[in-house]
Amino acid sequence: MAKDIRVLLYYKYVPIENAEKFAADHLAFCKSIGLKGRILVADEGINGTVSGDYETTQKYMDYVHSLPGMEDLWFKIDEENEQAFKKMFVRYKKEIVHLGLEDNDFDNDINPLETTGAYLSPKEFKEALLDEDTVVLDTRNDYEYDLGHFRGAIRPDIRNFRELPQWVRDNKEKFMDKRVIVYCTGGVRCEKFSGWMVREGYKDVGQLHGGIATYGKDPEVQGELWDGKMYVFDERISVDINHVNPVVIGKDWFDGTPCERYVNCGNPECNRRILTSEENEDKYLRGCSHECRVHPRNRYVAENGLSQAEVVERLAAIGESLETLVAQ
């Protein structure tokens, strides 16, 4: 059965004059054709994921390709049964990818048009994965890695991308004098991060051209050596990559059983992404810790209209009490 919706994932590092006005004009056009999605615009380029029916997405691609400097912009296309977004957002930012460099000086940022790692095709990347002398580094957030990653890839001990440069500096013995290949969802983060590694003095740095999304669609590699699913920042949450021998590697936050269902911790001050079943979400009040379960503004408790007595009952079932809540 044909799927009616197309999801477009794309980015391009290209100088954009008057980027704030560009963002406003871009939003107006997207709304005029009924497109949904999330787009970041900066002086350094554009980065977005959008969805719509065939006609709408075709209009959008034609429009983008008509813009100066974007004639060759590469759209990665998924076909789906439902919209991947509920609304349309286009926002101006200082950068489309923020590396979190320690001096926070945007003039000292990496320009991928000048400095970036060597591009590897899916076939070349797969060959590198099988090379014991190559270090494979996942540049995504921890919760993205936990849902799915390339076999043998290093999981940096970080919560988000901004922490990655410092983590690499702190663990440089893992990478110095070795070939390093990096990957991310669609390629936008790796363009900048691989350039940063080159600037740091790493001699042999490669990146998966087009990211995981392209690797999964390649007719030759068919996503092989990828375990789990790929996390995406839209209503789908995850997509399949390995079409040869897929496996589930995600583990439930609470009991460690295989799981590929993500929720945000019920404590709005925590908001950690955790893998868990519906059963355990109910059992643990969607809280990743006792502190989060008993937090006065626990969203799970509010959404389900639980009384204090019901909360006490749920906590007692897992050997906990409301004492922390009372203390607050």
Curated annotation (Swiss-Prot):
GO molecular function: oxidoreductase activity, acting on paired donors, with incorporation or reduction of molecular oxygen
Catalyzed reactions: uridine(34) in tRNA + AH2 + O2 = 5-hydroxyuridine(34) in tRNA + A + H2O
InterPro entries recorded: Rhodanese-like_dom, Rhodanese-like_dom_sf, Rhodanese_C, TrhO, TRHO_N
EC numbers for this chain: 1.14.-.-
Active site (UniProt): 184 (cysteine persulfide intermediate)
Annotated signal peptide: none
GO BP annotations listed: tRNA modification
Domain Rhodanese: 130-224
Key words of the record: Oxidoreductase, tRNA processing
Broad class of enzyme this protein falls into: oxidoreductase
Entry function: Catalyzes oxygen-dependent 5-hydroxyuridine (ho5U) modification at position 34 in tRNAs.
Family, per entry: Belongs to the TrhO family.
Name of the featured protein: tRNA uridine(34) hydroxylase
Organism this protein belongs to: Streptococcus sanguinis (strain SK36)
